[in-house]
Design a protein with these regions (language model features):
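Hydrophobic residues within membrane-embedded alpha-helical segments of Major Facilitator Superfamily
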Residues: 16, 20-23, 42-46, 92, ...
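Alpha-helical multi-pass transmembrane bundles of energy-transducing inner-membrane proteins
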Residues: 30-32, 119, 123-126, 130-215
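Structural signature of hydrophobic alpha-helical transmembrane segments
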Residues: 5-16, 87-96, 141-153
Length: 215
């Protein structure tokens, strides 16, 4: 269990779903049961590892960051790969991994059209990496990267597997599927939000402000 106390375990919880998603892309599309089973097992492993962190965490010092790690990343702007958890982020991390397990269990038998478990489950696991990363990131640029990772699979999941109901939307000449409209709206709003975040980070770097979230 020593690996879980020096930041390695936390990194595994974050990146294991991403590695699993990559492996899923290598599995032939026709082997749906293998894809579903592999995705479920991967999510369960991630959940178990996050649950183990509950026993490694010192709740008497819940206000302090623990089980983290810091590695120099982009030296020119003093950005680091810095992660850690406290009494607030740990429950959210465990909840994130648990909900992912439930989502995969449900989607195995209720996968929306078009039924492509390979793409859907791989996207869901990439989404999990982004979610887990946002809860543990202690560097502003690292947080931004993980936040953007969340947005990419969400956009495709909404646009491909969303509601196919056709509706009339002001501004569109013809009727449009709800999922297409929702994905466009999602893209526009997140694009503006990401632009503002990126601009704010750039200003912090230019003014030589600290981009370490704990300082």
């Amino acid at each position: 269990m020593e690996l879980l106390t020096n930041g390695v375990g936390l990194s595994v919880v974050v990146f294991f779903p991403l590695i699993s998603a990559f492996i899923i892309t290598l599995i032939p599309k026709a082997q749906e049961q293998l894809i579903k089973g592999f995705a479920l097992v991967s999510s369960l492993i991630t959940f178990v590892l996050s649950a183990v962190l509950l026993f490694q965490f010192d709740f008497s010092s819940a206000d302090k960051l623990q089980l983290g790690n810091k590695i120099s990343w982009i030296k020119s702007i003093n950005a680091n790969y810095e992660i850690g958890i406290d009494g607030i982020s740990l429950p959210l991390l465990v909840l994130s991994t648990f909900i992912t397990v439930l989502a995969i269990i449900y989607s195995i038998e209720h996968l929306p059209e078009p039924k492509s478990p390979k793409g859907f489950l791989a996207s869901l696991l990439v989404l999990e990496t982004g979610m887990n990363g946002t809860f543990v990131a202690l560097d502003l640029i690292l947080f931004f990267v993980f936040f953007e990772i969340v947005l990419l699979p969400m956009y495709f999941m909404i646009g491909i597997w969303g509601d196919k109901t056709v509706r009339t939307v002001s501004g569109f000449k013809n009727q449009i599927e709800t999922r297409l409209y929702a994905s466009i709206k999602f893209f526009v709003f997140t694009l503006f939000g990401s632009a503002f975040k990126a601009s704010s980070i750039a200003c912090c770097i230019k003014k030589e402000f600290c981009i370490d979230l704990i300082n």
